[in-house]
Amino acid sequence: MLSDVEVGAFLSGGVDSGYLASASGADQAFTVGFDEGDRYSEVNKAAKVAEKTGLKHHVKIISKQEFWDALPDVMYHMDEPLGDASAVALYFLSKEAAGHVKVVLSGEGADELFGGYNIYREPEALKKVAWIPFVLRRAVRKLAAKLPDVKGRDFLIRAGMKVEERFIGNAYIYCEKEKAQILKNKVTGPSTQEYLSQFYEELESENRGSLQDMEKMQSVDLNYWLPGDILQKADKMSMAHSLEVRVPFLDKEIFNFAAKLPKEAKIAAGTTKYIFRKAVSEFLPQETNERKKLGFPIPIRVWLRQNDWYQMVTDLFTSKEAEEFFHTEKLLQLLNDHKDKKADNSRKIWTVLTFLIWYDRFFTTCSK
């Protein structure tokens, strides 16, 4: 890669960033982690990649108080509420990198192009029941929906749905019924499913019904999740620190190459990104190349069950701003059920939490 300045790379313990850091000619690598055990920190795994490739490795460990304190600034630079906690990690990662380089490489796009998300394996799993007539699967789905949350329930429900119904992208957090329960004002716009139905129809028409379910899922993510979340937060969090982020996997030639690959080249042998992993294996430690997709592990699930965060979120959920938009007793129920480990409501809580912080930053604080 040609550049007039020293180039760094964002480095997690995964295959995408590991390959970029190893093969691109980057000079330095940057990783963030959390002091919540290996499950929520990829620092040690990233260090092995950096050691193998001889990269100078910079690490930032983010405390939960730092994370909380940064939220107003993160929401300010995002310009809009974003229910994706990894934006905060990217904020700190960009800040760390900006102290050393002007340009960094990042692995955005590889999962969408080469089939890296675990949910893309679902169509293959559902083939086990494909021999059952759809009308029967639909009937079983209705019965399963009435069951308590037991193992296998979700599979039965999703087996009775077409991909156009069951997959609306990685950003799915609240169903329409849940939205109606927590919001004081009725949502007048189309539901997420209704919004995407036109896209699915156009996709079907353009490809004359030739796309497999996984390819439809990739198309949704490439057209909505990637530009609406992944690239937005990378761009805005890096620009908050005057850092330029480049995303080589989204080069036009790579995009066109990946688009021609059959499904079997992406999901095979029980793994995601099959052909990609094969192609880059020589650049990475074996354990890195064989790792399952983890995403950006953020310990908000843990922190929301700890007393300090629980109290801070309770204060927000009972504020006058929360009262304006939400049935606060429903918010507190989500929070309490999560703290008591009755459910994992972390993403639902986080989505409301970031909206309230964004609203306070732009409308309450600014008006003062």
Regions found by a protein language model. Give the residues of each.
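Adenosyl-5′-phosphate
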Residues: 55, 86, 99, 103-105, ...
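A long, amphipathic alpha-helix that forms part
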Residues: 1-5
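A conserved beta-strand->alpha-helix junction
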Residues: 43-77, 192-201
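Short, solvent-exposed loop/turn segments at secondary-structure junctions
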Residues: 15-16, 35-37, 65-66, 110-112, ...
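Short, polar/flexible loop-turn hinges at active-site or ligand-entry regions and domain interfaces
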Residues: 58, 79-83, 125-131, 264-267
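Short, glycine/charged-enriched secondary-structure capping and boundary segments
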Residues: 24-26, 43-45, 74-75, 118-122, ...
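Active-site adenylate/phosphate-handling loop in enzymes that bind or generate adenylated species
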Residues: 92-151, 225, 230, 234-254
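ATP-dependent adenylation/pyrophosphate-handling site
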Residues: 6-53, 58-59
